[in-house]
Each structure stands twice: as C-alpha cells, then as structure tokens.
Amino acid sequence: MKRRIVAALVTALLPLGVTGCSIASKTSACEELSGPLKEAGVALVNARLGEAENPGESFTKLAEAYETASAKITNSEVKASVDQVAADWRTVAEKAQALSADPAKADEEKIQDLQAAFEQLNTHQTELFHTCGYKY
C-alpha cells in the first residue's frame, strides 16, 4: 500500500520537476540577454538622436552581442528567438549602411526597406520579450 502511494506521488510530481527545470533553463537563458538589451536601448537612442556616426556599425555590434548571448543559451525556444533577433539586427545594419553610404542618393525604396527591416525586428523582439516574460 505504501509503495503504491509513493509511486503515485512520484508519478504526480515528476512532471512538476521537469517543468521546473524547463522554467529554470528558460530563466537563465533569458538572463543572458540583459547585456544585449541594454546595448540595444543605447544604440537606438543614439541613432534616433543622430548621435551615432554610423548606425550600421552600431546595429552590427548589436547583432554580435545577441550572437554572443545565443552561444551561451541552451534553451532551444529562447535560442531560436535570440538567433532570429540577431539576424534581424544584421539585416537592419545592412539596410542602414546602404542608406548612410550615400545619403544624397537615398531613394524611397531604400528607406522603405529599412523601415520594413525595423518592423520585422520589432516583431521578433516582441516575440522574444513574450518568450522571456518581459514586461514593457
């Protein structure tokens, strides 16, 4: 009788233990993002204020920061989301670089491409925030 009770308790509590590990893994994975998120905030403010001499370089550094964080993340859900955000920062960097290379020749299409890249980045960054449970 006692064995059955113990077996039932172990069976009932085992999923909770596994879930706890998953949550801890997700939490530690999301903690790796604190540096890149701070860098992203500063870079965006500087770019918006026109203080960044080369926004493309700033955005490339952000992509690298996310890639560095991703290398330390083992949670597959968070890692996939971080990798997507890093790729989006690279795309934004390329589009910004194309515009800043010759601002006099910036056409409407290049501007729209950059805006679309930022929208895509915003979508994926928001998904990452939801994955990590960040409130904003």
Segments from the language model and where they lie:
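Sec-dependent bacterial lipoprotein signal peptides
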Residues: 1-21
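Bacterial signal peptide processing site
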Residues: 19-25, 133
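Membrane-proximal amphipathic alpha-helices
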Residues: 26-30
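Alpha-helical segments in soluble extracytoplasmic regions
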Residues: 32-103, 107-126
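Short, low-complexity, Pro/Ser/Thr/Gly-rich segments in the mature regions of secreted, periplasmic
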Residues: 124-136
